[in-house]
Curated annotation (Swiss-Prot):
<keyword id="KW-0378">Hydrolase</keyword>
<dbReference type="GO" id="GO:0005576">
    <property type="term" value="C:extracellular region"/>
</dbReference>
<dbReference type="GO" id="GO:0006508">
    <property type="term" value="P:proteolysis"/>
</dbReference>
<dbReference type="Pfam" id="PF02102">
    <property type="entry name" value="Peptidase_M35"/>
</dbReference>
<feature type="signal peptide">
    <location>
        <begin position="1"/>
        <end position="19"/>
    </location>
</feature>
<dbReference type="InterPro" id="IPR029463">
    <property type="entry name" value="Lys_MEP"/>
</dbReference>
<keyword id="KW-0165">Cleavage on pair of basic residues</keyword>
<comment type="similarity">
    <text>Belongs to the peptidase M35 family.</text>
</comment>
<feature type="propeptide">
    <location>
        <begin position="20"/>
        <end position="182"/>
    </location>
</feature>
<feature type="disulfide bond">
    <location>
        <begin position="266"/>
        <end position="284"/>
    </location>
</feature>
<feature type="binding site">
    <location>
        <position position="324"/>
    </location>
    <ligand>
        <name>Zn(2+)</name>
    </ligand>
</feature>
<keyword id="KW-1015">Disulfide bond</keyword>
<keyword id="KW-0964">Secreted</keyword>
<keyword id="KW-0862">Zinc</keyword>
<keyword id="KW-0865">Zymogen</keyword>
<keyword id="KW-0325">Glycoprotein</keyword>
<keyword id="KW-0645">Protease</keyword>
């Protein structure tokens, strides 16, 4: 049963930063400088990433949902016998302006930064044996002031094969499981509860409209999903329909929705987050204080499409749940049909464009 819930922060540890969202930019991301990511094994499942600016321009790199993020976000894909190992960490959405300086790294041409992280924390590698690590995609960049997202840059890594000790890896993953099971549940109250319920009702209505738009097909499907065939339209419409059903059910359903952060994950950059393995969604304080229920500006953020974005991550709503492959309009429209169908922000932007009349 889904509960719309809220509680003061209770946590086993504190997390500081999460996934990025990209503002529209005038320049195509394919013209941006490329980041090279070199993956090496430090010890066991601890990996070092060296990120180098191979372009000829200065870059302000957003670290949220990327290397140097201290949160249990997805940094690499892990493959065992050719099959990707499911991600067991956290997916989040954060604001696109007013970002704090501690989540930005400046890289001049030729400069690098490093990050070390344990891949066993966010993926169940208890079976052990050889696995292959790799990552590629688009990372947000900020303007010269470093406060507002203004572009994207492409990154790609080498393939790294490591041999995993399953017993040791299981202990790391168990720490994440403990983290997501310690909170107490309580109901949403006061203005935050009212705001959340309003957003969920409007999310249901908007998702229904988006499903109808997808079924009808046309230029918007080509713009966001790069396809207009029957099969693609059906997949898009079916996910939107599932989100509409889930968000309209405030007393049942398959997800637990918190009005307040139960795990001390939120920061002043984070709007909301999802723990897909638990089908758990939580709003953060700025969901209420910095965003309207609906934003009529094209590609803008608001409460309704933030909730929609998070619902698409939950596999209990529609399987498989979406990933965070790209954020923001200019990054999302670069995706292939396959990636767009698995990208949360593509669905959020498609739906938001209906409200905004884009």
């Amino acid at each position: 049963m889904r509960r719309v819930s809220g509680i003061l922060a209770v946590a086993a540890f504190t997390i500081s930063a999460f996934a990025g969202v990209i503002q529209p930019v005038a320049k195509d991301a394919r013209d941006s400088a490329e980041l090279d990511v070199k993956l090496t094994q430090v010890d066991g499942t601890v990996i070092k990433a060296v990120v180098t600016n191979n372009g000829d321009k200065d870059l302000n790199i957003l670290n949220l949902n990327f290397f140097r993020d201290t949160a249990p976000v997805k940094k690499v894909s892990i493959y065992s016998q050719g099959v990707e190992v499911p991600f067991g960490g956290i997916r989040v959405r954060h604001k696109t302006s007013g970002l704090s300086s501690d989540v930005i790294t400046y890289l001049a041409p030729g400069e690098s930064f490093e990050d070390e992280f344990d891949v066993a924390i966010t993926s169940d590698l208890s079976q052990g044996g050889p696995v292959v690590l790799q990552t590629q995609g688009y990372v947000p960049t900020t303007d010269t002031g470093g406060k507002t997202l203004s572009g994207v840059v492409r990154y790609k890594s080498n393939k790294l094969e490591i041999d995993v000790d399953g017993t040791t890896a299981a202990k790391s993953f168990a720490a994440m499981n403990q983290f997501v099971k310690i909170a107490k549940l309580s109901s949403c109250e006061g203005s935050q509860g009212d705001d959340t319920r309003r957003a969920l009702r409007d999310c249901a209505s908007l998702s229904t409209l988006a499903a109808a738009q997808a079924w009808a097909g046309g230029p918007k499907m080509l713009e966001y999903f790069k396809a207009n065939d029957d099969a693609t339209r059906k997949l898009v419409a079916d996910r939107f329909t599932a989100v509409a059903l889930e968000s309209s059910n405030l007393t049942g359903g398959s997800t637990t929705y918190y009005c307040r952060d139960p795990y001390n994950i939120c920061t002043n950059n984070i709007i909301a987050y999802t723990i897909p393995a638990e089908n758990l969604i939580s709003n953060c304080p700025i969901y209420y204080t910095e965003f309207d229920n609906v934003n009529r500006k094209c590609h803008g953020q608001d409460r309704v499409t933030t909730s929609l974005h998070e619902f698409t991550h939950a596999s209990s709503v529609f399987s498989p749940g979406t990933k965070d492959i790209a954020y923001g309009y200019n990054a999302c429209i670069l995706l292939s049909t396959r990636d767009a169908l698995n990208n949360a922000d593509t669905f959020a932007l498609f739906a938001q464009s209906i409200n905004a009349g884009c």
